[in-house]
Amino acid sequence: MKQGQVIPIFPTTITITNIGRDFEQDEMSYMMSFKDHVRDNGSNTKDIYILEQPELADIKALCHKALQDYLRQVYNPINPDHIEMKITHSWLNFSRREQFHYKHTHHNSILCGVLYIDAAKDTIVFTKADSGDNWQIQSKEETPFNMHDVPISVSTGDLVIFPSNLTHSVPTIKTERRISLAFNSFFNGTIGFIEGPMKGINYLKINIP
């Protein structure tokens, strides 16, 4: 009997792109002005609406486009002109050598993203959700089917979009500094069944100002 085919189903999707340009001097100067206005953890800015500042309007547009690309490529809505991903919160992270970010998720958010402002060589690690399995098998080699942690290499200008309930972390930083801009988002518009025999089921209109 031939060996059975392994078929991955219900994959978790992340997208990664590069904004394709350097950060302008005035953008960098403005973002660096927040490095001394961080929370007690010494990393996250107190301002959690950083992308609402007019000085970062172009950067916000790039982040918004990446969210819309994810929405259309992954969710593929039947009503693309009546639904979008709306950025709800955004903040800067200033990290130094030997610091790290614990494993965490983002609550009250559908998709979140990280734009790397200053990260010559960095990594974001995604962790598989706990399936409730109560056993451990040492694998001969790691594959997409048995990996528990997936590191993704990133650098300055990279923009990563992923589901907000996906556990992620940042390993110990080996460079002098790491600056990133993180943001949350939520559906804005109409969701649920829009057309067909199920029309109206779970229909919801969301209006985020």
Tell what function each PLM region has.
Residues 93-161, 191-198:
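Catalytic core of non-heme Fe(II) oxygenases with the double-stranded beta-helix
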Residues 101-104, 168-174:
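Short beta-strand His + acidic residue motifs that chelate non-heme Fe in jelly-roll/DSBH
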Residues 4-7, 169-171, 184:
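Karyopherin-beta/Importin-beta family HEAT-repeat alpha-solenoid scaffold
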Residues 112-114, 176-191:
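A short hydrophobic beta-strand segment most commonly corresponding to one strand
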Residues 1-82, 100, 203-208:
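Non-heme Fe(II)/2-oxoglutarate
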Residues 79-90, 125-126:
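A short coil-to-beta-strand element that immediately follows conserved catalytic motifs
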Residues 168, 177-179, 193-197:
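Extracellular and organelle-lumenal recognition/adhesion modules and their flexible linkers in secreted
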